[in-house]
């Protein structure tokens, strides 16, 4: 039976460590400030933004909320980002995605100053990661590395397979695993004989947005399975890209949905905010 990797518990440990670091900064008269921008009122985005504000309050980070109407123009949004770039009291800027269709997401992400890009999405941040330089790392992949390390799961020399090649998870994940000396394969919708590839994995990371796609026949005995998916099953119940009930008896360790990768993403966002000030 698989060991359950408890993302809630590990993310709480990280937030508690950050709380101490923020308190130490405050003693020196330094305040950590995160600006969060939401355009429109996408219900999922509102929940995510609320969770981020809650985490900020817990850790001791000051959060500035900019809730803009759906009809905000691209120019108005870019102007706000530029203003926050120039504001020395703001350490991190986060624009909640997705943005309304009339706004070019790439343009907005590129406008965020790399030294305030706590989401790690700016092309400069991505470039730094790919050549092994210091910079902000996308929060979900960074959180997965922490889940593995804090669960004493060895990455060095291990066969690591990622299903999904998104810019937010798959690609940065591959870079971080390489940094830890994992042997990395990325699979996607054009991969031939997917099961043959995934069965080689000591560590399998699944991020494709397909409900319960990975079943026991995709993994080898004792594999570590990290489920990044956030889907709903036919009964409307929250689940992931992995059929947990089917995979769990065969896996060595597995992340649940909810309570696995999700909480880590926000913990690492807080980590990026605090690091931006300390450095």
At which residue positions do the language-model features occur?
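Positively charged, low-complexity intrinsically disordered leader regions
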Residues: 1-30
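Short beta-strand segments enriched in small/hydrophobic residues
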Residues: 32-40
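Short beta-strand segments
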Residues: 38, 94-98, 163, 207, ...
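Glycine-rich phosphate/diphosphate-binding loop of Rossmann-like nucleotide-binding domains
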Residues: 41-53, 135-224, 228, 233, ...
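Short beta-strand elements in bilobed, periplasmic/extracellular small-molecule ligand-binding domains
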Residues: 56-70, 184-186
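Short, well-structured alpha-helical segments in soluble
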Residues: 76-88
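Anion-binding alpha/beta catalytic cores of soluble intermediary-metabolism enzymes, centered on
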Residues: 94-155
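Rossmann-fold NAD(P)-binding glycine/threonine-rich loop
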Residues: 106-122, 126, 229-279
């Amino acid at each position: 039976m698989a060991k359950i990797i408890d993302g809630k518990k590990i993310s709480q440990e990280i937030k508690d460590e950050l709380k101490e670091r923020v308190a130490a900064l405050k003693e020196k008269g330094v305040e950590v400030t995160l600006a969060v921008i939401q355009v429109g009122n996408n219900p999922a985005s509102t929940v995510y933004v609320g969770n981020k504000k809650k985490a900020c309050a817990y850790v001791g980070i000051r959060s500035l909320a900019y809730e803009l109407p759906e009809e905000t123009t691209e120019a108005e949004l870019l102007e706000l980002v530029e203003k926050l770039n120039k504001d020395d009291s703001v350490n991190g800027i986060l624009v909640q995605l997705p943005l309304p269709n009339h706004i070019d997401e790439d343009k907005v992400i590129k406008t965020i100053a790399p030294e305030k890009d706590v989401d790690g999405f700016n092309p400069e941040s991505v470039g730094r990661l790919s050549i092994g330089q210091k910079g902000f790392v996308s929060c979900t992949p960074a959180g997965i590395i922490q889940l593995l390390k804090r669960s004493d799961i060895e990455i060095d020399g291990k066969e690591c397979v990622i299903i999904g090649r998104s810019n937010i998870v798959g690609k940065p994940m591959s870079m971080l695993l390489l940094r830890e000396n994992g042997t990395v394969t990325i699979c996607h919708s054009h991969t031939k004989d997917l099961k043959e590839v995934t069965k080689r994995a000591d560590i399998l990371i699944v991020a494709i947005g397909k409900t319960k796609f990975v079943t026991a026949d995709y993994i080898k005995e004792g594999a570590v399975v990290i489920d990044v998916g956030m889907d709903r099953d036919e009964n409307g119940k929250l689940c992931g890209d992995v059929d947990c009930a089917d995979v769990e008896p065969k896996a060595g360790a597995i992340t649940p949905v909810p309570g696995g990768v999700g909480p880590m993403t926000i913990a690492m966002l807080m980590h990026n905010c605090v690091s931006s000030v300390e450095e």
